[in-house]
Every structure is written in C-alpha cells, then in structure tokens.
Amino acid sequence: MTHKNEARWTTVFNQYLREKKLYGFFELKHTVLEYLPFSKIEAVQYDGLQATAKSGLVWKLSDQDMREKPCDTLSIPPLPSYVVIKFIDGFYLIDITDIVKMREDGEIAISRSKAEQIAKKIIKVELKKKKDYEEE
C-alpha cells in the first residue's frame, strides 16, 4: 500500500473519530492481506498502548511544529487503547490487551476472521478503487 493510500485511510479514520466522538488511543495498521503479522506492531507501540490504557498520557506539544497549537501540554486520563487494523473491508478496533494475550499465547498474526470475532468495533468501508489496496 502506498504512503498516499495510508495517509488517506488515516484521514478517513480520524474523520470518523471526530464525527462519532470516539475516544481512546489508536495505532493504525494497514494490510492488503487477510491477516496482520504482529511483527508490524513495534515494541514502542505495544508498550505505549498498554501504558496509555493504564495510566493515560501527558504530552508536551512540540514548539518546532509550525502549525498553531491549541495548548502547550495535554494530560489525558486512561482510555481504551487499540490497534486499528485496516483490512480491505474496514477498520477493526482490537483492544491492545487482546493483542498482547494472543502474542503471549504464541500467535504470530491476527487474521481478519479472528479480528472480526474480537474487535470492540468494526467500521466498514466501501471498496472504491482496486489501486487503494495494492502493494507498492
């Protein structure tokens, strides 16, 4: 999947979050396969999502960013933390604790069918163009 397509799907997901007022911490992963290897989730992402679910987040917004910022620092309470997998048919919100348990049980990937069973939410999207789902 091209970076342009990844950026587009991230924009679509972020718009959904704004419209539906869905709150949490989200790490988006895109795949054109019927599964997502856990190796695509970096250690810092596993650690970060578990920490935000348990302790929340305090984050200093960068002064280097040229865009206007609403404030200097964010302090957010613990909220659900998800790995969001963009499969061909939609976004699957998988709680980080479920991903961690699967890894501890020896799993190396999550299939779309397994994601459908354990997802806290599934946001279906329409397939518009085949090129949206092709590998680079």
Where are the regions a protein language model picked out?
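Acidic-basic catalytic patches of nuclease active cores, encompassing PD-(D/E)XK
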Residues: 1-22, 134-136
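Short connector loops at helix/strand junctions that flank enzyme active sites
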Residues: 23-25, 44, 76-78
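Active-site donor-binding loop signature of nucleotide-sugar glycosyltransferases
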Residues: 28-30, 96, 127-130
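Mg2+/Mn2+-dependent nuclease catalytic core
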Residues: 31-55
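Surface-exposed flexible segments
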Residues: 35, 40, 93-107
